């Protein structure tokens, strides 16, 4: 059986940042509940394999995949097998249009999760992107036709890890997730990143340039970054240990530093991005605040 690891590729994924993240964890992280309001592929979760976790993301199909993997892995594997068999009966573009058209349809977690995984395995560079109406609109990778959608060993390995943990897995807002955290928790927040191209760093700045790529229908703004830092600071005041990441812009650094966070910058590697210029070695901001 393959070892557990991220089962989807996600923009901004933390896999290549793990050494920098692990170096900034609290010494008692194994004793704390793990809280992640921007879960994505969950690279840090898979590295830590916490026994207790509160996991959330605004992308509902993604969270359906996580829940299915935790609660109905057999059903998830079955549905992925159905989609893989269907792919062999259609042209690849026709199959892709069919499956992406089902992403917003109702269904069981296994059905919705399988659609998400199949599309993630088939879209260009694993790039989850939606339009202003919230509908998925990333392009098909024409070289994806031979990829295994099921990856049974990997998914079964992930399911074993999830089955052994006390998990709360929901599609909920980051605000609600952080508000539920406090004493004894460790929060890892990896939100959409700030961008210097936004112009003057005002608290009411418009949508971030990075949100030319949308993860959800609601664009992320600098006002959201301020609200996030405030929410994380309040959680630290309640006793949580907080670690957040971002681009090392002057604005992001000031937002976190002014709220009592220790701000550091380190070079990491990223391989999934809408912008090819941001793949490879990039500087990343790490903001930590220990529990009060």
State where each predicted segment sits.
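SAM-dependent nucleic-acid methyltransferase catalytic core
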Residues: 2-18, 24-29, 73-213, 227-230, ...
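Conserved S-adenosyl-L-methionine
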Residues: 30-87
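Short His-Asn-centered micro-motif
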Residues: 36-38, 56-57, 170-172, 189, ...
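Short, polar loop motifs at secondary-structure junctions
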Residues: 38-43, 154-155, 247-250, 291
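Short, acidic/turn-prone active-site loops that include or flank metal/cofactor-
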Residues: 58-62, 194, 266-273
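Conserved Class I SAM-dependent methyltransferase catalytic core
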Residues: 224-269
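Class I S-adenosyl-L-methionine
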Residues: 257, 261-292
């Amino acid at each position: 059986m393959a070892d557990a690891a991220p089962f989807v590729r996600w923009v901004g994924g933390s896999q290549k940042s793990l050494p920098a993240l692990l170096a900034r964890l609290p010494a008692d992280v194994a004793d704390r509940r793990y809280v992640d309001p921007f879960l994505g592929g969950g690279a840090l979760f898979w590295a830590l394999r916490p026994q207790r976790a509160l996991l959330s993301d605004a992308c509902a199909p993604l969270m359906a995949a996580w829940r299915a993997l935790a609660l109905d892995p057999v059903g998830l594997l079955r549905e992925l097998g159905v989609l893989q068999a269907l792919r062999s009966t259609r042209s690849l573009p026709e199959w892709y249009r069919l499956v992406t058209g089902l992403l917003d349809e109702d269904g069981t977690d296994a059905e919705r999760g399988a659609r998400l995984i199949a599309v993630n395995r088939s879209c260009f560079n694993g790039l989850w992107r939606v339009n202003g109406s919230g509908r998925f609109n990333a392009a098909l990778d024409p070289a994806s036709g031979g990829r295994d959608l099921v990856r049974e060993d990997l998914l079964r390995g992930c399911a074993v890890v999830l089955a052994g943990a006390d998990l709360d897995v929901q599609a909920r807002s980051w605000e609600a997730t952080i508000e539920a955290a406090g004493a004894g928790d460790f929060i890892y927040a990896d939100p959409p990143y700030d961008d210097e191209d936004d112009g003057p760093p005002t608290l009411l700045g418009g949508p971030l340039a990075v949100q030319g790529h949308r993860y959800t229908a609601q664009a992320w703004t600098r006002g959201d970054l301020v609200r996030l830092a405030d929410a994380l600071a309040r959680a630290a005041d309640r006793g949580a240990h907080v670690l957040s990441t971002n681009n090392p812009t002057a604005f992001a650094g000031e937002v976190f530093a002014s709220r009592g966070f220790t701000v550091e910058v380190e070079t990491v590697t990223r391989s999934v991005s809408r912008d090819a210029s941001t793949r490879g070695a990039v500087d990343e901001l790490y903001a930590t605040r220990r529990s009060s």
